[in-house]
Structure formats: C-alpha cells, structure tokens
Swiss-Prot record:
It comes from Pseudomonas aeruginosa (strain ATCC 15692 / DSM 22644 / CIP 104116 / JCM 14847 / LMG 12228 / 1C / PRS 101 / PAO1). Belongs to the LpxH family. Mn(2+) 1 binds at residues 8, 10, 41, 197. It is found in: Cell inner membrane. This is UDP-2,3-diacylglucosamine hydrolase. PANTHER family: UDP-2,3-DIACYLGLUCOSAMINE HYDROLASE (PTHR34990:SF1), UDP-2,3-DIACYLGLUCOSAMINE HYDROLASE-RELATED (PTHR34990). GO terms for biological process: lipid A biosynthetic process.
C-alpha cells in the first residue's frame, strides 16, 4: 500500500471541475491507499465550522466514506482554511494535523508543512499571518456573525490576489535559508509542503548530508498527487 499527499485544491462550488476530479481521486486512488495527507488550502475559503454550506458538507461526507473504508485521512491548515476545526474533522472522519508535523514514513522521519511559514521574505504576509493565527484573533473571528466573516473572507482573498500579482517571484516563494534551518531543527532530511504552487523536487545539502524538499502541485489547470511507498515516490499531474 502507499501514502498519498495533496494540497492546494482550493475547493469551491464555483469550480465543479476540480470537485469532480477530487471525487474521482478519492474513489480511484485514496480508497486503495494506507493514508491520505491534505497539506492545506483544501478549501478556497473557510469561515468556520458553524458556517459549513451544502457543498462543504458534501465534501466532508465523501471523505468520511473513504475513511470508513480504512484509509487514514490527515488534514493540515492552509492560509485559506485555517478556521477548519474539530466539527468538520469529526464529520469528515479525518485528523487535524499541526503545522509543522513530523511523521514516520517507512522508517524515515519526514517533515510536513503547508509551506506559507517558509516565505519569510514576504514580510507583509508574515505579519498578517501572525495576526490571523493569534489565539485572540481566532477567538474573535469565530464569534463574528457569519455574514461579517463571509465579507472579510472575500476581502482578504481579493487583497491576496492583488498583492501576489504585484510581488516579485522570489518574495512569494520560500526563503532558501529558512528551509535548511527548519529541517535541521526537526532533525529531518525530507520536507514535503505545498502553498507555492510550484511542484518540484529540490535536492539539498544539510550539514554535508543529502536532503530533499518536495513541493506539491496545486489543482487549477490539472490535479497533482505525490504517492510514496516502500519502493520510492512519484509526483505526477493528471487532467481535471
């Protein structure tokens, strides 16, 4: 059996092509896997478990069916869906995974992250991230009226798109010096993350030892999945 890793699906009712591809992925691949790890930005936006709509509940039910079939499902927050909580995870049959997390993968410790915390050169975003993830801010956000949360989510998404277009490419990518620092701190030689929408495998040298950073692809023009088993790993795109 194998372990699957995906991220940055940005699921929303307005993208039925991505939804169809994801449901097919669940039926054709996830059901046969030992585990499925979703490393953030699973949804385009999430205003709180109490604001789940029919579309989001249908996704939770689809995950639950796969989990009930024996596949372990793990979900990590992204920068778009960091308000996902225990209620959704109970309904979906998945486990909420802290960012970062180290897992044992066929005898090797592997670091999993969404990836946005590695983009330290984007100082404006890092300030916003610290503010949004502050426990007091999270408490306030969860207690705002749903209509206010919807309005705030739309505003943040609009501003994020505009700022991303204006920023230099190297600013919104991971900071090269931050990657080995974080990996060294967790005692790993393999890092898997998403967020940057730049699927690739980057060979590294950490303290004279070979290491690697695997970046997951985003689901927009095509889907992406990383599959790892005892014999190796492969990340490949597939049509939506």
């Amino acid at each position: 059996m194998s372990v699957l890793f995906i991220s940055d699906l940005h699921l929303e009712a307005e993208r039925p092509d991505i939804t169809r591809a994801f449901l097919s992925f669940l039926d054709e691949r996830a059901r046969r896997a030992e585990a499925l790890y979703i490393l953030g930005d699973f949804f385009e936006a999430w205003i709180g478990d109490d604001g789940m709509d029919a579309f989001q509940r249908s996704i939770a039910q689809s995950l639950r069916q796969v989990a009930d079939g024996g596949t372990r499902i793990y979900l990590m927050h992204g920068n778009r869906d960091f308000l996902i909580g225990k209620a959704f995870c109970r309904e979906a049959g998945c486990t909420l995974l802290p960012d970062p997390s180290v897992i044992d993968l066929y005898g090797e410790p592997v670091l999993l992250m969404h990836g946005d915390s590695l983009c330290t050169r984007d100082e404006a975003y890092m300030r916003l991230r610290r503010w949004l993830r502050n426990p007091l801010t999270l408490w306030v956000l969860r207690h705002l009226p749903l209509a206010t949360r919807h309005k705030l989510a739309r505003k943040l998404r609009k501003e994020s798109r505009a700022q991303t277009r204006m920023k230099a490419v190297d600013i919104i990518d991971v900071t090269p010096e931050e990657v080995p620092r974080v990996m060294r701190g967790h005692g790993v030689r393999t890092l898997i993350h998403g967020h940057t929408h730049r699927p690739a495998e980057h060979p590294l040298d950490i303290d004279g030892q070979p290491a690697r950073r695997i970046v997951l692809g985003d689901w927009d023009r095509q889907g992406w999945a990383l599959e790892i088993d005892a014999n190796g790993h492969r990340q490949a795109p597939f049509p939506l």
